Amino acid sequence: MITLQVGVKVFLKNQDGKYLLVKRSPVKYPNVKGSWDIVGGRIDPGSSLIDNLRREVREETRLEIISEPKLITAQDIIPNAEKHVVRLTYVAETSGEPVLDVEENTEFRFLTIAEISKELDLDKYVAEVIRLGLIN
């Protein structure tokens, strides 16, 4: 039987118009080998998608979302025959500097979309959003 999970992710834009990337911990996420990603995670059933998104941002960065998150895409992630993840990606604004949960992420950077598009060690689903021009 296949398990369905839903994840929420967000391109967090700061006051300078740059987006937050976090480097995933290779200890917690050995399959991604420390690639650069955007903040997010799996939802907790029973609470809204946006509440889950805000929670993930607070847990991973101690930042707050200060604008209404806008859904930009949904992606299917099927890593194996037992799991199907639907990843919903948003864009929203934030302010301040992140304080990382080092068990989740080891580094952060704020970059323009042009800079992100040149990053070689980028999560493939983030790269797809950039390549398709879904965010600018």
State each model region's role.
Residues 1-20, 74:
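Conserved N-terminal beta-strand and adjoining loop/helix that marks the start
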Residues 42-67, 76-125:
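Unchanged
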Residues 23, 71-76:
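Generic short beta-strand segments
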Residues 18-59:
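Conserved Nudix-box catalytic region and its N-terminal flanking loop in Nudix hydrolases
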Residues 3-5, 33, 38, 66, ...:
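Short connector loops at helix/strand junctions that flank enzyme active sites
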Residues 12-13, 21, 92, 110:
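Conserved hydrophobic "DFG−1" position in protein kinase catalytic cores
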Residues 8-10, 71, 90-92:
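A structural signal for short, well-ordered beta-strand segments
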Residues 125-136:
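Charged phosphate-binding loop/patch that engages nucleotide di/tri-phosphates or the phosphate backbone
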